[in-house]
């Protein structure tokens, strides 16, 4: 997710999966109540095998602002609010950190009612393309289908910053290929890589 705030911080919110080596031949651990990944491990089955997904937001300089670690099969849109709620951008002086971006740019994975309603409720502008099936359903209904959601192409072009932030994170071998057993340990590994990115800018 790419977000822009006081000094243009952009939210691009994607999820990407880190592969866990040597786990495919191991019996899957018991899952916690309610489904999801293995209890306390943040691991789950996805098309890439046994994986962990990192959901993050980034500013206009490709620096991660917030992140959430989940099991690999978790849908990106389910972590939209948790990632946005974790954003804190310090201000100069004794003022509280900024936690509301001026705008966000996300891909079609976030083109749904709950995500758009959340942004509308918080007064955040967005650039989220409409899904093809949603567009077709709206057009089928004619005038009853309502107006298409607003979409700013220029703002959406800046979404690449989060993809570049992901690439920077994946330069850390322990992030791209997960070796940590517990999810909180892996979260610490990713956080250390984020700090390295910030210190290098």
Model segments located where?
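Short His-Asn-centered micro-motif
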Residues: 59, 67-70, 106-108
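Active-site beta-loop-alpha junctions of metal-dependent nucleic acid enzymes
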Residues: 68-94
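Generic alpha-helical structural context detector
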Residues: 82-85, 167, 194-197
């Amino acid at each position: 997710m790419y977000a822009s705030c006081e000094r243009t911080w952009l939210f691009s919110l994607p999820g990407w999966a880190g592969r866990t080596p040597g786990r495919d031949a191991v019996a899957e651990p018991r899952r916690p109540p309610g489904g999801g990944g293995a209890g306390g491990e943040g691991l789950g089955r996805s098309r890439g095998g046994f994986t962990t997904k990192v959901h993050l937001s980034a500013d206009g300089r490709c620096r991660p602002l917030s992140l959430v670690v989940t099991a690999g099969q978790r849908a990106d849109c389910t972590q939209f609010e948790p990632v946005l709620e974790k954003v804190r951008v310090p201000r100069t002086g004794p003022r509280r950190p900024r936690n509301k971006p001026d705008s966000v740019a996300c891909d079609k994975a976030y083109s749904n009612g709950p995500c758009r309603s959340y942004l509308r409720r918080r007064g955040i502008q967005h650039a989220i393309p409409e899904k093809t099936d949603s567009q077709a359903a709206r057009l089928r209904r004619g005038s009853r289908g309502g107006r298409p959601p607003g979409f700013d192409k220029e703002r959406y072009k800046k979404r690449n910053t989060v993809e570049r932030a992901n690439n920077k994170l994946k330069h850390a071998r322990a992030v791209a290929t997960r070796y940590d057993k517990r999810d909180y340990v892996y979260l610490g590994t990713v956080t250390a890589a984020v700090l390295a990115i910030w210190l290098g800018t």
